[in-house]
């Protein structure tokens, strides 16, 4: 899980149930379903079949976080994955599937926010810009974000601290740092969503999962 979702994420740093069993082995209860889906995809040889492969799963997960309305420490995650395709159509298809699911459940007043975090090359340049911006206001950041500044400054954009949230509003926008290929990809995702009459807004501060 640490390799899959990153050492600097809240899930790894604050929310995983990790303990040693009676045999002295380190045990972690599954905090999310994606890593297990990828492992199953590889171990069962689906990567050797015709691609892309589309899968779905429903599994129980556990996170040590503050219980609140609608959020428990044991929960179920329903996920869909499209392995073997980097097509913007695949991204739009999953978004459309999510909308269709909520529509079928009769859920109203939903809003869709999207963003692109580009490729590793894009993010490297963006990290530099963020680090420069947040370094100038480091003394105002919460202790957690001060630690994130060197390791993964993008995570500061996701901080729940009111002060950090306000500072992040003036930060550089990731879309401005996308390379030509990533920019075209994001534009095509938007084109496909519009073709299906799916309304959305772009939120450049969505960086979950990094």
Where are the predicted features?
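TRNA-recognition modules of translation machinery and tRNA-sensing kinases, especially anticodon-binding
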Residues: 1-210
């Amino acid at each position: 899980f640490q390799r899959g979702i990153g050492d600097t994420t809240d899930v790894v740093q604050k929310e995983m149930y990790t303990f040693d069993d009676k045999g002295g082995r380190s045990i972690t209860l599954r905090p999310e379903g994606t890593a297990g889906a990828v492992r199953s995809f590889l171990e069962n040889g689906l990567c050797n079949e015709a691609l892309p492969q589309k899968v779905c799963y429903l599994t129980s997960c556990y996170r040590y976080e503050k219980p609140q309305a609608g959020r428990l420490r044991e929960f179920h995650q329903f996920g869909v994955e499209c392995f073997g395709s980097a097509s913007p159509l695949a991204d739009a298809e999953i978004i459309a599937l999510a909308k269709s699911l909520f529509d079928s459940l009769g859920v109203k007043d939903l809003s869709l926010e999207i963003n692109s975090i580009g490729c590793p090359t894009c993010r490297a340049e963006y990290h530099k810009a963020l680090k420069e911006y947040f370094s100038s206001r480091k003394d105002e950041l919460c202790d957690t974000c001060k630690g994130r500044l060197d390791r993964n400054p993008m995570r500061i954009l996701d901080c729940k601290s009111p002060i950090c949230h306000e500072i992040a509003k003036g930060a550089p926008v990731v879309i401005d740092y996308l390379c030509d290929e990533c920019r075209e990809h994001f534009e095509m995702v938007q084109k496909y969503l519009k073709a299906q009459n799916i309304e959305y807004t772009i939120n450049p501060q969505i960086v979950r999962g990094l």
